Amino acid sequence: MSFSSKVKGEICRYVDMCKEDALAEISAIMKVSGTIAFSGSGLSFKMTTENPASARLIFTLLKEHFNIHSKLMVKKSNSLKKNNIYMVVISEDMGVRELLYETGILQDIDGIMNLNYRINKSMIETEENRRAYIRGAFIGGGSISNPERTYHLEFVTHSEEYAIDLKDIINTFGLNSKVIQRKSSHIIYIKEGEQIVDLLNIIGAHASLLELENIRIMKEMRNNVNRLVNCETANLSKTVNAAVRQVESIRLIQNKIGLQRLPQNLREVAELRLNYPDESLKELGQMLDPQVGKSGINHRLRKIEKIAEELRTGN
C-alpha cells in the first residue's frame, strides 16, 4: 500500500462531524474529483476515486449529513495495474441540483446557472471548517510521495482560481504551499518535510504523521553518520597526504645535503617522521624529550618542507 493510500485510509475514518464540517469536506471532494453531466434524465454528478476508503466516506457523508442515497459503482481500470475504479453517482432525483448549490459548485448569476470555481468564504469560517476542507481536498485530489525517497505533498486541481483559494486556506495554518501549472492542471504543493508533517496534523492523519517523523529521524541520523564518515575520511586523506609529502621532503634533504646539516630541533623531527611515517603529529611530539605539542611539530615540519622546496628550486 502506498503512503498516500495509508493517509487517505486514516483520514477517511472521520465521519462523526457537524453538518458545517461535513459540508466543507464534501464540497472540497466534489470540487477536485467530480464531474457534472447533463442528459435527458437531467443533471447528474459523479465522483471518481481509486481508493475504496474514499468512496465509502463520500457515500456515508452524503447519506448521513445530506440524506442523499447515492449510487456506488465499481469498474476495472484500463491501466496496466488493473485497479478498481470507484464512482459515486448522484442523479437529479436524488437531489443533486440542491447539493451542487449548497456546496457552492453551482451559483446563479442573473438567474442563470453557472459553475463557481472559487471557494465560498461562508464554508471556511472556522478553523475546524478549514481543516475539514483541506482534508476533503486531499481525499479528492491529494497525494504524498514515499517519504523514504523524497518529501512531496500535492493537491491536483483543474482551476487556477480554485488552486489559489485552496493554497490560501492551507497557508492560514502558517504553511508555505505554492501553486504551479502542470499541463492543464494546477498543483498546490509542499516540499519541506516539517511542513508536510504539519499538514498531516491539520487533516488529522496522526498515525501517518508519526510514521513520517520516524522516517525523517532515521534519514537525518543516516545523513549525519554519512557526513561524519565523509569528514573523517577527508581528514584522514589529508593527514596521509601531508605525511607522504613530509617524508618526500625529508628524503630530498637527506639526499641533497644530509640531515646533519639541519638544526637539531628540525633534525629530530625529520628522523622521527622517517622512522614513524604513519604516526600523528601529536604522537610524534610525545616521542621527543622534552615533549612538543602538535602545533610545534607542525611548525617544524613546515620549516623542513620550506628547506626542501628551496633545494628543489635551487634557491
Swiss-Prot record:
Keywords: Cell cycle, Cell division, DNA-binding
DNA-binding interval(s): 280-313
InterPro entries: Homing_endonucl, Intein_endonuc_central, Sporu_reg_WhiA_N_dom, Sporulation_regulator_WhiA, Sporulation_regulator_WhiA_C, WhiA_LAGLIDADG_dom
Residue spans crossing the bilayer: none
UniProt-listed GO biological process terms: cell division; regulation of sporulation
Listed GO MF terms: DNA binding; endonuclease activity
Similarity remark: Belongs to the WhiA family.
Stated role: Involved in cell division and chromosome segregation.
Name of the protein this chain belongs to: Probable cell division protein WhiA
Species of the source: Clostridium botulinum (strain Eklund 17B / Type B)
Phylogenetic lineage: Bacteria, Bacillati, Bacillota, Clostridia, Eubacteriales
